[in-house]
């Protein structure tokens, strides 16, 4: 029962970026071809481009090495960022009080699959 695998997945856990900022980047590359996504990420000024670029690289490497898929045919099928654990810190304020600082983390997941429209 040999099943033909057409997708590969990569996930980065506890990335030190807020999920809201990561989602801004992921929304721009979702549904694009891998080469187009690399070009977009290279010139996008947002802060979350570096971890998304690394996860995309990992997903493409998984597709090529584990499942023998061609990089030119890959499309970003799914891209999402879930909330990871929040690190809580305190900043001293006036009159002996303190303000809470939440340092948010994300779990970034990208799934790449072969393009269904081959030759079209």
UniProtKB/Swiss-Prot annotation:
Q: Which Pfam families match?
A: Ribosomal_L22
Gene Ontology biological-process entries? translation
Q: Which GO terms describe its cellular component?
A: cytosolic large ribosomal subunit
Q: Does the keyword Ribonucleoprotein apply?
A: yes
GO MF terms on file? rRNA binding; structural constituent of ribosome
UniProt keywords (A-Z) are: Ribonucleoprotein, Ribosomal protein, RNA-binding, rRNA-binding
Query: Do you know which InterPro entries this protein is assigned to?
Result: Ribosomal_uL22, Ribosomal_uL22_bac/chlpt-type, Ribosomal_uL22_bac/org-type, Ribosomal_uL22_sf
- Subunit description: Part of the 50S ribosomal subunit.
Q: What does this protein do?
A: This protein binds specifically to 23S rRNA; its binding is stimulated by other ribosomal proteins, e.g. L4, L17, and L20. It is important during the early stages of 50S assembly. It makes multiple contacts with different domains of the 23S rRNA in the assembled 50S subunit and ribosome. The globular domain of the protein is located near the polypeptide exit tunnel on the outside of the subunit, while an extended beta-hairpin is found that lines the wall of the exit tunnel in the center of the 70S ribosome.
Q: Which family does it belong to?
A: Belongs to the universal ribosomal protein uL22 family.
Question: How is this protein named in the record?
Answer: Large ribosomal subunit protein uL22
- Which species? Oenococcus oeni (strain ATCC BAA-331 / PSU-1)
């Amino acid at each position: 029962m040999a099943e033909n695998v057409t997708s590969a997945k990569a996930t980065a856990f506890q990335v030190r970026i807020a999920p809201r900022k990561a989602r801004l980047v992921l929304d721009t590359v979702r549904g694009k071809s891998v080469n187009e996504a690399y070009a977009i990420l290279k010139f996008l000024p947002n802060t979350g481009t570096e971890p998304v670029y690394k996860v995309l690289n990992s997903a493409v490497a998984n597709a090529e090495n584990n499942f023998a898929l061609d990089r030119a045919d890959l499309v970003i099928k799914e891209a999402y960022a879930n909330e990871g654990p929040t690190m809580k810190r305190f900043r001293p304020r006036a009159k002996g009080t303190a303000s809470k600082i939440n340092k948010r983390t994300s779990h970034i997941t990208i799934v790449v699959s072969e393009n269904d429209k081959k030759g079209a």
